[in-house]
C-alpha cells in the first residue's frame, strides 16, 4: 500500500502548494495530487488555480513523491496542449507524473457555462479520442489521428515524456456503472468513487472486490494495476486498520482526500505532518 494526499486546486497563492508538497514528502507520504477545476460550485467564494502550475511548483520543492491530477477532464483540453503540459511536468519532476483522468464534474458550472461540452455521453466520446491521440503525441514520432472530434495530420511533438513508453494513467469512475470501468481497464489504474445518485454511501471493501472482478475480466490480469481509493483516515492504528481492510480487497493506493470545508488548507498541513496511517 502506498499513501498520498489530494487537495482542491483552490486558493490564491500557488506557493502554498509547494510548501504543502514538501511537508507531505518529508512526512513519508508517497504522492501529492490536486483537483482540476476551472470553476466548482455556483456560489463558491474562493479562488481556483491552475493544477499544472501548482504541480510544477510542487515538482520544484520535492524529489521523490508522485505528482498528478485527480482528475483532469481531457474532454475540455486541447490534446496538443495537454501533451505539452504533461511532458513538461514529467521532465521537470524527473519522471514522477501520474495523469489522473475522468469525465469531470459538475457538467454545468465547470463545462456548459464556459462553452464546453456538458453532455456526459458526448464528453465520454471526446475523452476516448483525446486519450488515444494523447498517447500518439507522447510517442514523439510523426502521428495522425482522424476521429469524430479530433483530427491530427502528421504532427510530431518533441520531446516525449521521460517515463517510457508513457506516464501512468489512472481513470476516475463511478461505481456501479459498468462502462467507465470497462474504459478504465485498458489503462494503468482506477480511481473509483460511489455513484451517490444510486447509493447513499461510500465504497466498501466488497465494492472494491466487485469492481476489480469486472476490470480483471477485461484485462485478464491485474498485475501492476493500481487501485486508488480516496477517503479520510484517523491518525494511528485505528486509521491503519480501516485502510488494511481495503488493502486486503485490492486497493494499492490510499489517498487522504481533503475537502474544501472550513480552514481546509491548515487541516491538510496538519494531516500531512502526522504522516500516513500505516
For the regions a protein language model found, what residue spans apply to each?
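Active-site-adjacent structural elements that line small-molecule/cofactor binding pockets in enzymes
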Residues: 1-278
